[in-house]
């Protein structure tokens, strides 16, 4: 398949083990191919009746799935992981067409997706409570039980991966899930739904509804939904939390960030430069945990900046389906204009553009309407600048200088966000001392933007709460029942 040829020809809702058209609507949306600007799908947003049918189907499937043993669920999840692994290139291609990231990166995403399913398949058979001995031979025990129908609401930067990150632990615990992808990227999650069905989950266990804010509201407020997990912006996350609170539903929120990356003068320069590029330019900079505030110790500021600019200018921009492309288009034109607007404001506030920050027009005529820009490196930045304070969500790196460890820690933590942070240094004592003080949920030492499924991922402060990945996520998709067993006579106060 090549850029500019794909068109969606099947329904984009999934319910009861099959693709379906929604029975009612809350509007229509268009999905684009960012590389070419073409419309690849016009689809109906699910209305309240469709959402209710999806939830009821999930509720029925939950009754079957929750009664299966952990090992039975394990085998089915492993089969789903195997299918994803076999269809890796197909799924990655679909992800690239609808999202715009390079096929090189998309394959990484699909690999972490099947690894996520394998990881939670391994945990499915090991979930257990504990036994507590009480006086007189009595005892108590706990049971870890599923919640019921969970809702996953995904973001457009990692459509397939996020669906796996949310559904794998949910299903491993015995839950069902209704998933709503971003209306910008509605396509690839349907492949996951079909794969789950092929692997053997009960029909209705993983359903997909399409739509925007109205559809999300129907899901969050549905009386039979037990939990909501959301990935996206802080303002939307706040609304999700408010709507869910009315039904006393637990939520997991993975929201935005403006993360610090601290480069000390004793760093390995080559690795620090590579880390800074990884922290800013993956998926065209459209990554919530990106380390976009790059603090560089003054002794190496000029050397570091020169090398970063040199490497940034070498990034191959263009058709994301070509093997040598390393940066594709941004998600859509409004977002491209928004990111370019941040660069304009940065210059007005005194920042200096060392490279990029402007529109890129590929030579291929079929890409002329795509949403491309050159990756941007800003210097002469101050902590009070808009480009340093607000999440840009594009390929824009802001470089700031610092003198001392104490100073940079205070500045790094001076943000309402707390998703991620990183430090590059050869001093292992300093590395651990610094990350202990950083107010962020995911910290990197001498690397950045790696997300092994074994490690919990989530934020502090306004970047959200709850965790995805790692063993601890089981606690966010299950509930604990305590059973007290009396082996003697009842001691009554009456």
UniProtKB/Swiss-Prot annotation:
It comes from the Eukaryota. One of its GO terms (molecular function) is acetaldehyde dehydrogenase (NAD+) activity. GO terms for biological process: aldehyde metabolic process; carnitine biosynthetic process; protein homotetramerization. Its main location: cytoplasm. The active site is at 254 (proton acceptor), 288 (nucleophile). The modification N6-acetyllysine is found at residues 30, 298, 344. PANTHER family: ALDEHYDE DEHYDROGENASE-RELATED. Homotetramer. This is 4-trimethylaminobutyraldehyde dehydrogenase. It comes from Bos taurus. The gene is ALDH9A1.
